[in-house]
Amino acid sequence: SRFVDIIAERFDAGVRLGPEVGSGMIAVRISPDMEMAVVGTPEHFRRYGFPQTPADLVAHPCIAYQFGDGSLYAWELNVDGKKITHPPQGQWAFADSYMEAKAARLGLGLAYVPEELITDDLAQGTLIRVLQRYSQRLEGSFLYYPHRNVSPALRAVIDTLRM
């Protein structure tokens, strides 16, 4: 994902994962960190088997997250304390994690989504989580804005969303 120059593009503020922002910007946390989960349907695992390691994901159709610039999010996983990436291979890409989870429910492949989106599915058995010990915890969302000239309206938004 790219950093949006909110000043040049005339935005009052932006939202992104993690607190890394450009110089002259302030970042305010607005959501908790996210535990990511690799999930699929029972039928998917009957057909393809259960992956035991991240390397096994190449044998599975995977649902991708697509950024606004068209690039795909490479799944970030932990192996022996090191971050590795898995570029998802499959026919489906969505610019929305909710749609990724829905596609997984429909049996279109494995999805790598925030656990909070699929908690009910896991409890009901409609989705099964795999590779849990390899999953990453991603930093939550931050609202970022220029240090100068905070309008009363933006201040109200910041104060409401701040965690």
Name each model-derived stretch:
Residues 73-87, 121:
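Ligand-binding cleft/hinge of the Venus flytrap
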Residues 64, 85-96:
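Short beta-strand-to-loop elements that line the ligand-binding cleft
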Residues 1-23:
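Central regulatory/effector-binding core of bacterial HTH transcription factors
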Residues 101-126, 135:
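A ligand-binding cleft/hinge motif common to bilobed small-molecule-binding domains
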Residues 24-35, 40-65, 80:
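Flexible hinge/capping segments at coil-to-helix
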Residues 131-163:
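A late-sequence structural motif
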Residues 1, 16-19, 40-42, 113-116:
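Beta->alpha turn/N-cap motifs
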Residues 28-31, 124-136:
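Short beta-strand->loop
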